[in-house]
UniProtKB/Swiss-Prot annotation:
Higher taxonomy: Eukaryota, Fungi, Dikarya, Basidiomycota, Agaricomycotina
Protein name: Class I hydrophobin 20
Keywords: Cell wall, Disulfide bond, Secreted, Signal
Gene Ontology MF, one: structural constituent of cell wall
Assembly behavior: Self-assembles to form functional amyloid fibrils called rodlets. Self-assembly into fibrillar rodlets occurs spontaneously at hydrophobic:hydrophilic interfaces and the rodlets further associate laterally to form amphipathic monolayers.
InterPro entries noted in UniProt: Hydrophobin (IPR001338)
Family: Belongs to the fungal hydrophobin family.
Secreted recorded as keyword: yes
Signal peptide: 1-22
Keyword Cell inner membrane on entry: no
Amino acid sequence: MLSHPMKLLFFVFALSALLAAATPVVEVRDYQQFSRVSLINFISFNKARGGDLCANGKKTMCCGELKTFDKNILGLLDGLLTTVVGLAGEILKPTGLVGLECVPITLLGNGGLSDVCKANGVCCKDLTLRAAINVGCVPINIL
């Protein structure tokens, strides 16, 4: 008959073997491919439940350029402000980045977001000037 310490040792080894056999082993060789699949699954889940990749009323956009909001950008947008009513308060107190040459990302396509957007994937406020300039953008990882 086994002594108490031997029983405990046997129990620990048996439990370790059981847990090791029950734990799935996942080997990821291509991390970028894994992250793309994870992002696509996340987006698909959000779309299926009626959500969006971007929260708080922001829109998923693909922008050709991202700029920090400074006086040069304000000068560029100054002419546009006269034609857009109600945006002056938002422009004078900006948060985030300004996205230039932006288009909304609505379809994933066969290859995922990286095929749809080869530039900068961002979440922008639902505030667009002249359909290509977005205010209050935050970069997202599209790979």
